[in-house]
Design a protein with these regions (language model features):
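Active-site loop/oxyanion-hole signature of alpha/beta-hydrolase fold enzymes
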Residues: 70-119
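Conserved alpha/beta-hydrolase catalytic His-Asp/Glu region
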Residues: 153-155, 169-222
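Catalytic active-site module of serine/aspartate enzymes centered on a nucleophile-bearing elbow/loop
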Residues: 253-285
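Acidic catalytic loop of the alpha/beta-hydrolase fold
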Residues: 234-239, 263-264
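Short alpha-helix in the alpha/beta-hydrolase fold that links the catalytic acid
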Residues: 226, 240-249
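Flexible "cap/lid" loop of the alpha/beta hydrolase fold
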Residues: 129-133, 137-168
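Conserved HGGG/HGGXW glycine-rich cap/lid loop of the alpha/beta-hydrolase fold
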Residues: 23-84
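Short beta-strand/loop motif that positions the catalytic acidic residue
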Residues: 224, 230-232
Length: 285
């Protein structure tokens, strides 16, 4: 596979790494060609629900030249490999399963989680936080964009979970995409979500939606020891700021960082913001 980022000053590889219980997660890895940068702390990137790596291209093109980056896809993504003969069920997409996957994947990559910085978005942010509070994951720091305190779907979308997955394609085109266009103010954010939804594995989309419906993150956040920056965007109308602020308040080392837009978090301009926050962390943290 060619590097999805194009020509960058970094060595690229892609492979499926071990997840929990025989699942295998597609993982993109980059190591800077600059010898000093290649020795930097690794960054583990966990993107949002059904997100595709191309949506992060403006950020990653710059970042992979500065830090070793490992972009791990969660198990609802369409390139994830499930165990042979396994009949997929909603419980396969429970939040704790994502955490167990990530812990196994980090080990398979030969990384020491305590020496890594995490970067997550939406579902990815939520999975990282859940892993921290349950003691499944560890890290040096985590920069988390719009983690979900709860998964709130519009009332009209709930009946979708009762339908066969093969009916999702017309539903996404006729209802979900127009809804997103009305709901999302940022054009670039809408384009990313549209692309993600149209390329999603529909069966896994249905199963993970059913599993996420009853999820809440609140209990146990006070146990998280890893410093966490909770990043919110002023113009992001899809993710609730109230939830992010509550999460930051409950985290012993939580801090709110506001940026101009959701698109900004997908571009190289967010790198100095992350670096400035990480520079303030004391060695003991």
């Amino acid at each position: 596979m060619e590097d999805p980022l194009g020509e960058v000053a970094a060595d690229f590889s892609v492979r499926h790494v071990s997840g929990a219980d025989g699942w295998r997660l597609r993982t993109f890895s980059w190591t800077p060609t600059d010898a000093e940068a290649a020795e930097g702390r690794p960054v583990i990137v966990i993107a949002g629900w059904t997100s595709v790596v191309e949506g992060w291209k403006p950020l990653l093109q710059k970042w992979v030249e500065q830090r070793p980056i490992h972009y791990i896809e969660t198990r609802e993504k369409n390139r994830t490999e499930s165990p042979a003969g396994h009949r997929q069920r909603p419980v396969d997409f429970e939040m704790v399963q994502h955490c167990r996957d990530l812990a196994t994947a980090v080990h398979d990559l030969g990384l020491d989680a305590e020496e890594c910085d995490w970067f997550g978005s939406s579902l990815g942010s939520t999975a990282i936080l859940h892993g921290f509070k349950e003691g499944i994951l560890d890290g040096r720091s985590a920069f988390l964009i719009a983690p979900n305190g709860e998964f709130k779907f519009p009332g009209w979308a709930i009946p979708f979970t009762w339908l066969p997955w093969w009916l999702y394609a017309p539903g996404i085109r006729l209802l979900v995409i127009p809804y997103l266009k009305l709901r999302i103010k940022e054009k670039e954010q809408y384009i990313r979500y549209r692309r993600s939804m149209l390329s999603a594995d529909l069966k896994r989309l249905k199963l993970s939606t059913k599993m996420n419906l009853g999820y809440t993150i609140w209990e146990g956040l006070e146990k998280v020891k890893v410093p966490c920056a909770i990043c919110v965007a002023a113009s992001d109308t899809l993710h609730g700021h109230g939830e992010s602020e509550r999460i930051a308040e409950l985290l012993p080392r939580g801090e709110i960082i506001e940026v101009p837009s959701n698109q900004f978090t997908h571009e190289a301009g967010v790198i100095p913001v992350i670096q400035a926050w990480q520079a303030e962390l004391t060695p003991t943290e």
